[in-house]
């Protein structure tokens, strides 16, 4: 049983770290996406932020008894590449990193075959420029990480 939804978040982070897609993969301790974006300039040129989102639970019931629950953790990724002095950052690298993240997480079971599945749902580019910091190209990606529970 994988009802530890923080485990789902940590497993995504570990999977991306092992893939070597970015110089740094981290789950920053921030309360808002804006705070996460503001912290990007403190990280290496290529970084992936892993941020928790909503939890959703669905239940299958037969004969008045629960037989299965699907626990989904929404995860938002900020996939970023910097280019010193370039407004908008290094979009080519950010695009390539996003493709590699998509390949790595698509239907990935995070080592829990039949119990967990990653389902990337959407991705979009976002350019960010700070006045006194290098430009950053950022892609946001939403991934649904689902745990299939049959024991309680």
Predicted regions and their residues:
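Short, solvent-exposed secondary-structure capping/transition elements
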Residues: 59-60, 85-89, 114, 152
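Acidic-leaning, charged glycine-interspersed low-complexity segments
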Residues: 23, 45-49, 95-148
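Small/polar-rich, solvent-exposed N-terminal microdomains that initiate assembly or binding
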Residues: 1-66, 108, 112-118
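Extracellular/virion structural assembly segments
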Residues: 66-70, 78-106
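Oligomerization/assembly interface segments of phage tail-like spikes and tubes
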Residues: 67-85, 135-149
